[in-house]
From Swiss-Prot:
One of its GO terms (cellular component) is ATP-binding cassette (ABC) transporter complex. CDD domains: ABC_CysA_sulfate_importer. Keywords: ATP-binding, Cell inner membrane, Cell membrane, Membrane, Nucleotide-binding, Sulfate transport, Translocase, Transport. The gene is cysA. It catalyses: sulfate(out) + ATP + H2O = sulfate(in) + ADP + phosphate + H(+); thiosulfate(out) + ATP + H2O = thiosulfate(in) + ADP + phosphate + H(+). Belongs to the ABC transporter superfamily. Sulfate/tungstate importer (TC 3.A.1.6) family. It is a peripheral membrane protein. This is Sulfate/thiosulfate import ATP-binding protein CysA. ATP binds at residues 35-42. It is found in: Cell inner membrane.
Amino acid sequence: MSIEIANIKKSFGRTQVLNDISLDIPSGQMVALLGPSGSGKTTLLRIIAGLEHQTSGHIRFHGTDVSRLHARDRKVGFVFQHYALFRHMTVFDNIAFGLTVLPRRERPNAAAIKAKVTKLLEMVQLAHLADRYPAQLSGGQKQRVALARALAVEPQILLLDEPFGALDAQVRKELRRWLRQLHEELKFTSVFVTHDQEEATEVADRVVVMSQGNIEQADAPDQVWREPATRFVLEFMGEVNRLQGTIRGGQFHVGAHRWPLGYTPAYQGPVDLFLRPWEVDISRRTSLDSPLPVQVLEASPKGHYTQLVVQPLGWYNEPLTVVMHGDDAPQRGDRLYVGLQHARLYNGDERIETRDEELALAQSA
């Protein structure tokens, strides 16, 4: 079941929380709405579900406009962060609930309900807990019950609001893998909300990064990591080093040092330079690729690599976080050398194109 979100706007009083949002979600795709608090991601999810109504715009399921349909008529499964299980019902009865309250003409008979719930219990690996009550379950088990209950009515679309937010780190990891496997098996269309970058990129087919009621980028997880569309995405998606300097001619000036860019940008003046920790070139010896001296402040072994916090020597005030591969891990106090050739340059929120990007733009003009 595909979802088309067309020009959705939403205001609460004078506060605009969604600004002309448009997004197409193909049938069978799992999409993460990712962003900080106040980005509008949960409001958008609730509008898809019919739990909130947009100020303007349309929601279509497989081409059918459902914008004015009540939530109960949209055939959407919704899983809340805090489970919303019925405390007085067993696990079995919680999962069966949605089936037992269907209109009489749609309601399965008791034997069919039992068979379906039994199958779902096996699917979520909780058959041995069918007679327990929510108070007797762990957080991860409760979330599986909530998911099984949502799937019981065979929803066209499954929506999840911060589904793992209330769980500890290890349980979250296990449930993420389990949900991804379940999605591969059942091929349902799903949208989930999260503020956790790792969760979004691990589980989703596509990540939609939101900020202040706008979509900043909607792409495959790897694309969002490697090719951020905006400065916000670059800074939000994981750790990043920022250096403030100036472009003069074909060089980036930082402190008393200059770094050749290999081309002369059209823009000249103050810039912010961004590098992910693994994008910083680092060496024990100075070279044309790694000419800038740093001193190791912290060294944290991470298995096949070492994460370092290094202090630039004479060319910048703020420490940098970098990654160094190999068995010969540096020690605190060691001198190393770094290079900046994989950097992204911004003037405010505007990206300064590299030479290859400038050539591509010129050829397409």
